[in-house]
Amino acid sequence: MFHLGYSQVSDHPIKNLKQTIIILLCFLSIPSYAQTSLTLSSYDLPPYIGQELKDQGAVHEIVEAVLAEANRTVDVVFFPFTRAVNSALAGQYQAVFPVTYDDLLSKGFLLSNAIASYQLGLLGRKNDDSSLEKISEKTTIALVRGSISEQEGNSFAPARFVYVAQNEQAMRMLQSGRVDYVLIDKFTAADLMVDKLPYMIGLFAFPEQFTKKVDLHLAFSKKYIGAKTDLDAFNSALKRLESQGVIDAILNRHGLLFFENTSEEKVIRIATVANGDMVLMQRISAEYEQLHPGITLDWRVLDESILRRRLLSDLAISEGQYDVMTIGAYEVPIWNKQDWLSPLTDLAVEYDQNDMIDVVRDSLSNRGDLYALPFYAESSMTYYRRDLFEQAGIEMAAVPTWDNIRTYAKKLHAPEQGVYGICLRGKVGWGENIPIVSTMVNAFGGQWFDMQWAPQLNSSVWHQSVSFYVDLVSAFGPPDTHENGFPENLKLFSEGHCAIWIDATVAAGMLFDAKRSAVADKVWFAPAPVAETSKGSAWLWVWSLAVPSSSKLQDEAKEFIAWATSKDYINLVAELEGWVAVPPGTRKSTYENANYIQAAPFAEYVFSAISSANPEDATLPNSPYSGIQFVTIPEFTAIGNFTSQQINAVLRNKKTVDEALSQSQAFTVELMKHVRASQ
């Protein structure tokens, strides 16, 4: 029988607190009086809540929003799980969150209505007969000790539980065949694979019959005298925000909103990135629905890093949520090898594949067959304020070096006037701060791996490059550089707060558009900076639309992505928004169009930068990999994300450059060791 005694309790989020609660109920503190300002205890439970998550996670944001709606202000203090619960139980904090329902827990707390939920299930190896499997005495299930209540454990009887200290340990046991299943939340398992165990992606799945929804609650301590009043106010406010769609919007923003089951037969479920061109596509797609009355489009528009994580995590646990995925030049060759993408071999003649820019088409193809269709493509370049340069009496070099950029940024940095010398990406993510750091490393003569696949993250070139980057943005960038990615810097520059910005060429269409930019008549451009070499100093990326092989609406999804990436779509955007706003970088015909050339003074440069990019030869020393700002291996998402986190910590003064790079090197060495062992 499943049971947790007090001696077994570990410091883990969801656990049986039976004996702890009994003891603490005997030593309760003096009640406090009802307050409009609340102090709550919580703990890290990624991806739902955590001190390192964006806005501290969806659950944190929901609780803050609900209490604000209830006219309460709130301060949240993070502890390890046991201390978070015990502190609230003892009356030191008015409430704790998130918790799951438990008979024992309810003796010391008043639980709110559900604020969110997670999907608890058994993760096992992919098996065509998994739907026929049953739990028996021979079934072995690994789980973190204390991670579920006795009630939840009983639902998996008569299986034998194998207790471990960490989910990562349980996952390795599953991979080696030492257990049949791991009992774990879906998103937790998926994120673990994405971040630390990428070689396990696609090997496992959650059989539907062994998965259930578990609600999360805010729990008010019964020793807080205002508990009942605040509980009622919280539940009422929660209900109002739910009816207004606020809760779903928060969950969606964090990539935690599942698609609803629908009786409609043809709902195309689309995941895309919250960039301007994609948001415009979503708006214009209403015309597509009018032309296809039997089709409904259901969108998830997400932050770039969250999109990447949710798409890969969907594949990691074989969920199959999406019909259309927005992916890039990194994913296509890797996912194609795993048979995760449907080939696009039946495109109509008028689609005109030969009109695609060669390097763009090649990056999305295998043996001549396309596996994704390009929505827009980009390189990187330097944007700068001509007016500020003229006022300072300086001139942008025809091909600037990074030393030039530092000199300019120092001269133009005027934060007291609301202008920063330079804006660069600093946000965590292999697609956020890594592209700028990686191309800088290339320019300084470095690489991710040498020809023997030995990681180079602790090399002198990496130290030089990252130190230069950190010093540059710390001295002459916005104080919140560590929070800024593409959209944040686009906003800063377009509103006149950056003298220099080095980022994607796709931003040019927005910066030169007077309807969307306050500096449209003041901005100009130059190539991305170089240093020891120009090789790999500017990146190549292709945001594209693909249909996963798991989609049940193959034909419908393919028809939609063909429409969204067609010449007709480009003409439609030009008609509605102007030629400067059309998705760039994909079709030769766009750059042959006199209307586009007239509207986009950057057109010739962007076409040349994209066309000349060479992902096969992007580093000064020979490298065993393809890719400019990324390495085209499955493990790079984990390596890039980890390295990104360490560099971000340096920007926040939490680590030194030496610490960040030595830890990144150690992580990469260990990961590649596991990869070789698993092959």
Predicted regions and their residues:
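Extracytoplasmic small-molecule ligand-binding "clamshell" domains
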Residues: 35-103, 107, 298-306, 310, ...
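Acidic, polar ligand-binding/catalytic clefts
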Residues: 64, 76-136, 145-149, 204-211, ...
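Extracytoplasmic "Venus flytrap"/periplasmic binding protein-like
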Residues: 109-116, 287-358, 363-365, 391-393, ...
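C-terminal lobe and pocket-closing loops
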Residues: 153-157, 507-518, 531-641
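Conserved C-terminal helix/tail region of periplasmic/extracytoplasmic solute-binding proteins
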Residues: 248, 252-262, 296, 390, ...
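Hinge/lid segment of periplasmic solute-binding proteins
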Residues: 328-379, 403-404, 433-436, 520-526, ...
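Extracytoplasmic/periplasmic solute-binding protein
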Residues: 371-375, 380, 406-455, 498
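Glycine-centered hinge/linker elements that transmit conformational signals in sensory
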Residues: 408-411, 451-483, 524, 528-529
